[in-house]
Regions:
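N-terminal beta-strand motif that seeds the catalytic metal site of vicinal oxygen chelate
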Residues: 1-20, 85-88, 140
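Short secondary-structure boundary/capping segments
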Residues: 3, 45-46, 77-80
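Vicinal oxygen chelate
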Residues: 1-4, 90, 100-140
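Short, conserved charged micro-motifs
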Residues: 20-22, 95-99
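Residue-level marker for the onset of beta-strands and adjacent loop->beta junctions
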Residues: 9, 42-43, 86, 122
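Core segments of cupin and vicinal oxygen chelate
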Residues: 13-63
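Short, flexible, mixed-charge acidic loops at enzyme active sites
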Residues: 60-77
Length: 140
C-alpha cells in the first residue's frame, strides 16, 4: 500500500554548467525556470517540467564530482551499467514520433531510438546534459 504522506518533490542534478543545462531543458523540452539562486557557494536552478522540479546545481567549493557513465544498449535493454539512478522518465501525451523528429532536428541525441516498450507503448531515451538519460514514453 502506498503511503499518502509522501509526495514526489524533485530530482537533483549536479552540473558542470548549470545554466547551460537548465537552458537545454527549456529549449529542448519546453521546461520553465522557476528560480535561479545560489546556495552553499554554487548556482541552483529550479526547472519545472511535467509537474516535476529538476533542481540543477553547480559544483560547490571543494567538490570534485565524478562523471556519469553514458547509457548504452545491450541485447534487449539499455543501462548506464552503474549502481544508482539509471534514468528518469516522462509520459508524453501526444505523438511521440513527431516529438522525436522535432528533438532530433534540434540536435538531441537518442541513445535508445524510438521503439515499442514491454507494455506496447512507444518509448525512447534522450541524452540530456551532465550524463543524464531521460525516457520518453507515449501515453497509453
Amino acid at each position: 500500500m502506498s503511503n499518502p504522506a509522501f509526495k514526489f518533490d524533485h530530482v537533483h542534478i549536479i552540473s558542470e554548467n548549470p545554466h547551460e543545462s537548465a537552458q537545454w531543458y527549456v529549449e529542448m523540452l519546453g521546461a520553465t525556470i522557476a528560480k535561479d539562486t545560489v546556495a552553499r557557494g554554487a548556482p541552483q536552478i529550479f526547472v519545472e517540467l511535467g509537474g516535476m522540479t529538476i533542481l540543477i546545481r553547480g559544483r560547490r567549493p571543494g567538490e570534485e564530482p565524478a562523471p556519469t557513465r553514458p547509457i548504452r544498449p545491450y541485447a534487449d535493454f539499455s543501462s548506464h551499467n552503474a549502481w544508482g539512478t539509471d534514468h528518469f522518465g516522462f509520459i508524453y501525451d501526444g505523438d511521440l514520433t513527431a516529438l522525436c523528429d522535432q528533438l532530433s532536428a534540434k540536435g538531441v541525441t537518442f541513445p535508445v531510438e524510438l521503439k515499442k516498450g514491454v507494455g506496447g507503448n512507444a518509448l525512447c531515451y534522450i541524452a540530456a546534459p551532465d550524463g543524464v538519460s531521460i525516457e520518453l514514453m507515449e501515453s497509453r
